[in-house]
């Protein structure tokens, strides 16, 4: 089967300049690249054909031979190169331009590797969460070596660009029509060759260290909130900037209050006599004790809302919501029991004086009436 004309394959005129040829190749390679066509055999063959045409037409000497002799110029062992290397055509540059998100950008260059971010979990009390406080913490991290100041080299030692990756820290390889990029195996991504590594960090430029920090906890924080301490993470490689430290807040469970956002909830026990007659009770708040009036005929479960007595966060103050719990007296003596019996007798049949009982009895009557229908 006769080979197609290389200019025809790329869709350009014979007099096309280098820019037109490169532009045409990029457009077609993008269209038929195996990563996009996913196993389409016909597209793979077209991709090979496009590569072969471009390798010849992008090389001035090969193009001149092709223009004069056609495909015969590369027969009998004088082929276009079999795509084993980049040859005269800069495939690496083109694939880097087209698939930068896959291969990490265009032409390789030494990368500044920022330090790792660190996490520290801290537990605080509700009282500490409500008001701003300071906490001392210890973290194990990586810092720039004090001996070599992060260079990884002994004083006076030569630092040269890695001869393999030329300082990029990464190398590209072409296999068939695939271009891959990986960490340089000789410099391990540093992009440099050190004549005499630092005796303290052994050429790493970083050492492990325990650091003491003081963290300011802002008022109103809650469990799950994170505080970001910029530049307090691990030191970067090759003198690069440090990462950040994230302090994650955990607020301990409180023995009185439960929290929901900026609101606080608590139960307030009162006697059944106070519930019936009314009175005054002391309620705990974050600012101390507060006397609150209990209205007469208060039922269990009633909520008292104390506005602005909750948690203040970002300028907004929540409420303290108190649920009334009526306590039943225990260990009564005979005199007390007799008084309660007399009270019960005095209320017999007077359901209006027992609203819960009235509602319950009405509901029971309706239930049985419906069953009998």
From Swiss-Prot:
Subcellular locations according to the entry: Cytoplasm
Zinc fingers (CR-type), renumbered ranges: 132-210
Cofactor: binding details: Binds 2 Zn(2+) ions per monomer.
Xref: SUPFAM superfamilies: Chaperone J-domain (SSF46565), DnaJ/Hsp40 cysteine-rich domain (SSF57938), HSP40/DnaJ peptide-binding domain (SSF49493)
Name of one Pfam family that matches: DnaJ_C
PROSITE patterns associated with the record: DNAJ_1, DNAJ_2, ZF_CR
Cited Gene3D superfamilies: DnaJ domain, Heat shock protein DnaJ, cysteine-rich domain, Urease metallochaperone UreE, N-terminal domain
Classification via CDD domains: DnaJ, DnaJ_C, DnaJ_zf
Biological process (GO), any one: protein refolding
Location of the J domain: 5-70
GO molecular function: ATP binding; heat shock protein binding; unfolded protein binding; zinc ion binding
Chief localization: cytoplasm
Cofactor(s) the record lists: Zn(2+)
GO cellular component: cytoplasm
Sequence ranges of the CXXCXGXG motif repeats: 145-152, 162-169, 184-191, 198-205
Residues the entry annotates as binding Zn(2+) 2: 162, 165, 184, 187
Functional summary from the UniProt entry: Participates actively in the response to hyperosmotic and heat shock by preventing the aggregation of stress-denatured proteins and by disaggregating proteins, also in an autonomous, DnaK-independent fashion. Unfolded proteins bind initially to DnaJ; upon interaction with the DnaJ-bound protein, DnaK hydrolyzes its bound ATP, resulting in the formation of a stable complex. GrpE releases ADP from DnaK; ATP binding to DnaK triggers the release of the substrate protein, thus completing the reaction cycle.
Similarity-based family: Belongs to the DnaJ family.
UniProt remark on domains: The J domain is necessary and sufficient to stimulate DnaK ATPase activity. Zinc center 1 plays an important role in the autonomous, DnaK-independent chaperone activity of DnaJ. Zinc center 2 is essential for interaction with DnaK and for DnaJ activity.
HAMAP family: DnaJ (MF_01152)
Quaternary data: Homodimer.
Name by which UniProt lists this protein: Chaperone protein DnaJ
Native organism: Histophilus somni (strain 2336)
Lineage: Bacteria, Pseudomonadati, Pseudomonadota, Gammaproteobacteria, Pasteurellales
């Amino acid at each position: 089967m006769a080979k197609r004309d290389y200019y025809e394959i790329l869709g350009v005129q014979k007099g096309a300049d280098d820019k037109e040829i490169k532009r045409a190749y990029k457009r077609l390679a993008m269209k038929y690249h195996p990563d996009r066509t996913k196993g389409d055999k016909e597209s793979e063959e077209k991709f090979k054909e496009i590569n072969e045409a471009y390798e010849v037409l992008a090389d001035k000497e090969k193009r001149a031979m092709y223009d004069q002799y056609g495909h015969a110029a590369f027969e009998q062992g004088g082929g276009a190169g079999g795509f084993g290397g980049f040859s005269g055509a800069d495939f690496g540059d083109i694939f880097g331009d087209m698939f930068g998100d896959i291969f990490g950008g265009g032409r390789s260059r030494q990368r500044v590797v920022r330090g790792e971010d660190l996490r520290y979990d801290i537990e605080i009390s509700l009282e500490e969460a409500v008001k701003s406080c300071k906490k001392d913490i210890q973290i194990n991290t990586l810092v720039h070596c004090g001996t070599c100041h992060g260079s990884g080299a002994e004083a006076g030692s030569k630092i040269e660009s890695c001869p393999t990756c030329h300082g990029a820290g990464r190398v590209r390889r072409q296999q068939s029509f695939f271009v891959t990029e990986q960490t340089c195996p000789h410099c391990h991504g540093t992009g440099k060759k050190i004549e005499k590594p630092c005796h303290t960090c052994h050429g790493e430029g970083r050492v492990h260290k325990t650091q003491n920090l003081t963290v300011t906890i802002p008022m109103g924080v809650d469990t799950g909130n994170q505080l970001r301490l910029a530049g307090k993470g691990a030191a970067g490689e090759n003198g690069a900037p440090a990462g950040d430290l994230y302090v994650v807040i955990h607020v301990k469970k409180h023995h009185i209050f439960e929290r929901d956002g900026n609101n606080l909830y608590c139960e307030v026990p009162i006697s059944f006599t106070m519930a019936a007659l009314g009175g005054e009770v002391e309620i705990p708040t974050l600012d101390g004790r507060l006397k609150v009036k209990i209205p007469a005929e208060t039922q269990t479960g009633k909520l008292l809302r104390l506005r602005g007595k909750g948690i203040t966060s970002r300028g907004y103050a929540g409420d303290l919501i108190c649920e009334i719990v009526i306590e039943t007296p225990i260990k009564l003596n005979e005199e007390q029991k007799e008084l309660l019996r007399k009270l019960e007798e005095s209320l017999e049949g007077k359901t209006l004086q027992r609203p819960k009982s009235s509602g319950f009895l009405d509901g029971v009557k309706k239930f049985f009436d419906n069953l009998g229908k």
